[in-house]
Amino acid sequence: MSIRPDEITSILKNQIEQYQLEVEMAEVGTVTQVGDGIARIYGLDRAMAGELLEFPGDIYGMVLNLEEDNVGAVILGPYTHIKEGDQVKRTGRIVEVPVGEALIGRVVNAMGQPIDGKGPIQTDKFRPVESPAPGVVYRQPVNTPLQTGLKAIDSMVPIGRGQRELIIGDRQTGKTAIAVDTIINQKGQNVICIYVAIGQKASTVAGVVQRLEEAGAMEYTIVVMATASEPAPMLYIAPYAGCTMGEYFMYEQHRDVLCVYDDLSKHAAAYRELSLLLRRPPGREAYPGDVFYLHSRLLERAARLNDSLGGGSLTALPVIETQAGDVSAYIPTNVISITDGQIFLESDLFYAGQRPAINVGLSVSRVGGAAQIKAMKQVAGRLRLDLAQYRELAAFAQFGSDLDKATQARLARGERMMEILKQDQYQPMPVEEQVVVLYAAVNGFLDDLPVARVRAFEKDFLRFLRNERPEVLAGIREKRQLDDNLQEQLKKSIEDFKGSFTAAGES
């Protein structure tokens, strides 16, 4: 076989013309120590705080400690295959999560990856998990209500769009139930809801997701889940990721968003674990010195934006679990001081059958009053005062039986008011129905009913109004206040219904 130089030359020329020089530069470091979700890396002298690092096996980490001769990083995912001597690359990016409409109705992990088996999330939009809170000039006062559908909250501890309202109480007092009820009540209100589950059992979160699906609430809800079985870094990042997903709708689409963080006690514990493993100096209750900043930078991102930024809002409902009702512990006092009020749940009330178990005396809303509709203000002002007097008299009445008529009447009305504030789980109530029920209670229309029949009266009276007098409910819904004409109609409706209800009860 003869060698043809011209053919060889043409092949070589062709190869040279098609040759593309690709130089990939990467800053690489070496793992010197790894364990418990923490890695120490030597050689990444130019790494930034919060930067994303690439570990072998397509696992990422986040730089938290910048030290003299190494960096400390938390590993965002499984870390058992990472070993000493492995190479780690800088990415030059900070931690980002996917955002956008495609996430609505999905269950994702703290990195925004789907875990509900419904396929990949189709979005090309990303936002960094850490972003600065809007400044004072970019905000406007809270003035629009966010109805929870719970009589005790909407009347006495009202929440406005853009507010931060803490839900605090012992374990098993109904904290998650209040948050889930609030999400269900946003149906048809054009509010995007984000439920962030931090450090909970996977079975518990699955139950919440199922409940939301049954109520049709997953159509406007994103669930971000970092369960108890996941590494501490995932629990640490989860609430920031959820907040970022909400901020997209607030800033880009000018919509109202509700973000539930359930719960921040476990979030603080995860951060304490990371900080101690990174050898940061411990402070009170072994939490690091910046644990206040951990929660303040998250909750300050909740805001009601002014019209120049589109007027969207992000409302935060953080949850805190107390030990034996101790609200003066470190994390509870921190979060109470950051938020605009708190809903305090008591186990004694819960076990006594008062559900939701809200302690009205210790619960407060610092800005939500401005967001209440006028009709609710008209009935709720008296309600809080009457309940405060009832609690005082009830404590006093334990010591003596000789009570005058006026005191007995106050106690009787107080009992009926406490009864009317009870509400079944997953049964949120429209605000106009709350107003008519509370109007009947504060104006003494229930005083002559046996306490055991108060709930039945409420149920039947609302059915009567819906079927026989829908104009009363429609009037409150449209006017948002009780004018003289509406009050007359409402009084007449109560009296008409009460006659038939009392007669039915006696028969």
Swiss-Prot record:
Keyword Metal-binding: no
Single Gene Ontology MF annotation: ADP binding
Keyword tags: ATP synthesis, ATP-binding, Cell membrane, CF(1), Hydrogen ion transport, Ion transport, Membrane, Nucleotide-binding, Translocase, Transport
Topology in the lipid bilayer: Peripheral membrane protein
UniProt xrefs under Pfam families: ATP-synt_ab, ATP-synt_ab_C, ATP-synt_ab_N
Stored SUPFAM superfamilies: C-terminal domain of alpha and beta subunits of F1 ATP synthase, N-terminal domain of alpha and beta subunits of F1 ATP synthase, P-loop containing nucleoside triphosphate hydrolases
EC number: 7.1.2.2
UniProt-annotated site: Required for activity, residues: 363
Compartment list: Cell membrane
Record's GO cellular component terms: plasma membrane; proton-transporting ATP synthase complex
Gene3D superfamilies xrefs: 2.40.30.20, ATP synthase alpha/beta chain, C-terminal domain, P-loop containing nucleotide triphosphate hydrolases
Binding site for ATP: 169-176
Keyword Transferase: no
Catalytic activity: ATP + H2O + 4 H(+)(in) = ADP + phosphate + 5 H(+)(out)
Assembly notes: F-type ATPases have 2 components, CF(1) - the catalytic core - and CF(0) - the membrane proton channel. CF(1) has five subunits: alpha(3), beta(3), gamma(1), delta(1), epsilon(1). CF(0) has three main subunits: a(1), b(2) and c(9-12). The alpha and beta chains form an alternating ring which encloses part of the gamma chain. CF(1) is attached to CF(0) by a central stalk formed by the gamma and epsilon chains, while a peripheral stalk is formed by the delta and b chains.
Family according to the record: Belongs to the ATPase alpha/beta chains family.
Descriptive protein name: ATP synthase subunit alpha
UniProt organism field: Moorella thermoacetica (strain ATCC 39073 / JCM 9320)
Gene this chain is encoded by: atpA
